[in-house]
Amino acid sequence: MPLNKLIQDGDNQDLTDERFKATFDTDALAAVFHGGEDALKRIRELRDEVTKRWHLFDALPGAHRTRAERMEDVSRKLKNLMESVGEFADFTNNLDMLVIIRDVMGIEGFPLALHNLMFVPTIQNQADDEQTEWWLMDALQGKIIGTYAQTELGHGTNLGAIETTATYDKLTEEFIIHTPTTTATKWWPGGLGTSCTHVVLVANLIIDTKNYGLHPFFVPIRDRNSYSVMSGVRVGDIGTKMGVNCVDNGFLAFDNYRIPRRNMLMKHSKVSKEGLYTAPSHPKVGYTTMLYMRSEMIYHQAYYLAMAMAISIRYSAVRRQGEIKPGTQEVQILDYQTQQYRIFPGLARCFAFNTAAATVRQMTENCIKQLSHGNSDVLADLHALSCGLKAVVTHQASQSIDQARQACGGHGYSDASYLPTLYTCSVGACTYEGENMVMLLQLSKYLMKAAAKAEKGEEMAPLVAYLVKPDITETNDKFAKMLSHFEHIARHRVMHAYRQMIEEEKQGIERDYAFANHSVDWTKAARAHTKLFIARGFVKSVQEVSDEAVHDVLTTLAELYLSYELIEMSADLTANGYLSESDVQQIRHQIYDSMRKTRRNAVSIVDSFDICDRELRSVLGRRDGHVYENLYKWAQMSPLNERNLPHVEKYLKPMTSKL
């Protein structure tokens, strides 16, 4: 029996030939990628159940529908799904719902997108027991639809400048929610435009004229039966965006709108009837929603990248173009080294990012549990790490997806490829939930403190212990040597930025300005620190794989990932004579050697992502490889192929008939 389980009669012959070359069992690698055999089995069970329900599918590709039509499509599917999901899935299980939503809704959003990602987790992590009893089950069952309203028109990343107020009225035991200026209008929350009945609102808590800072409030904005907007609320859609247009991002403002005292989420902070304020055990316990969101973002980015790699590598095996030697047969474009250099590093990043996502997910869950018991010891480390991962992963994933799009030539530019959609969904994450440069600078503040400890010889946290670790000069362990190079680069960048900053301080420049004057160096240090974390995690995960054939494939991908990232930072390797140009050239050759080894298994590796055609939504990435005939069919579905089009009848025909 073939090792690749996707081989079927009648498929494109080039793709079939590629699959017969597999040196490993695709099911075994799929289990590694998806977190175990049980998880993989469950994914396939859910997919089979969805397949039985025709009313969850679309008649036309989304690209051939208007935005209003697409909003109607996803809302119809959501209603149908919520009515039937209990028959085959656990709607309280995050994995079940994630798998089903990816399959049914796609990645461009739907009315419950932010509801699932932020609204429900905030209730779970910041509401007290009584509040959880009031609201959680309704939220899980879709009886109320919510979003998370924090960002304002005038301020996003700078939370301290958020203007919305929630002033406590002791006489009525209510909070008065108010939007004092235009720039205080909540802006961007997904689902706010037309879908949400409620929001978790982040506003300044004010008691007796004293501002206690930002706190979350459970706020109804529309009647859930009539969907009429509540008096004192102004809400609407902000219009089309670069991507993710099945999410109705919106605006929200309040005119002295009143809510009950108990609508402030009170698991960590409390306000009594008399207006007495009880502070949380740690000032940043409210970060749990943000930490959860970032951990999920990293996972989604890895998955978007996996989809792009499946599309581009399958298509590169089907597409024949040009000749390596004139007069010979046209070759598969996957055989060109330039094509491999474009997309194989992205393939390696899929596994590196997927591992990082699993790690930070577990760390986030542990942190939230500890916070619930009043222990905030790991919060600072996790916050810093999540900032770095969010910035590096979103940037590199979107970068690799765009390379995959370009590698597919003109057809990659077509919506039929789904690559433009993957890119716009991925690149949006570079700015939402914290603009990437700001995220790197937040991590830099953490690294600045670590560097100060390193200079003083103090004990270091495990994440930054490399700052006082000597370089490994001799080792036969290839991974150990390459990780030592990552440590050297991160250490060099962090300590360089720190020492430059200290030199300015000695000249009388204040710390904040000295830091700002070297912020570019600090962002480079933050990137290197984050890449070290990802590299370590990837190597560790590969070493834990027991299946020998899968281990060999992942070892090659890890070598490709490490060598590619090192060459991206090669100037740091030769600085101060750490490595010679010859040493760096050896690392560069490792990239080419790893690409050559990966070539044979490339199609089978992306098959192991186990993404079905319905979910992939790509003509170029079809499992059967029948690209060209289906591109033609896809084009026939365009509404512009209808007769008597208004723009022709009203303007073009009268114009040409007179000439």
Curated annotation (Swiss-Prot):
Cofactor field: FAD
Sites where the protein binds substrate: K284, V285, G286, Y287, R294, Y432, E433
Enzyme class: oxidoreductase
Function as written in the Swiss-Prot or TrEMBL entry: Involved in the first step of peroxisomal beta-oxidation by catalyzing the desaturation of fatty acid-derived side chains.
Annotated CDD domains: AXO
Name by which UniProt lists this protein: Probable acyl-coenzyme A oxidase acox-1.5
Binding residues annotated for FAD, in chain numbering: Y148, A149, Q150, T151, G156, T157, G190, R319, Q339, Q340, Y341, R342, G410, E435
Sorted UniProt keywords: ATP-binding, FAD, Fatty acid metabolism, Flavoprotein, Lipid metabolism, Nucleotide-binding, Oxidoreductase, Peroxisome
A matching Pfam family: ACOX
Molecular function in Gene Ontology: acyl-CoA oxidase activity; ATP binding; FAD binding; fatty acid binding; flavin adenine dinucleotide binding
SUPFAM superfamilies the UniProt entry points to: Acyl-CoA dehydrogenase C-terminal domain-like (SSF47203), Acyl-CoA dehydrogenase NM domain-like (SSF56645)
Assembly information from the UniProt record: Homodimer.
Pathway: Lipid metabolism; peroxisomal fatty acid beta-oxidation
Annotated organism of origin: Caenorhabditis elegans
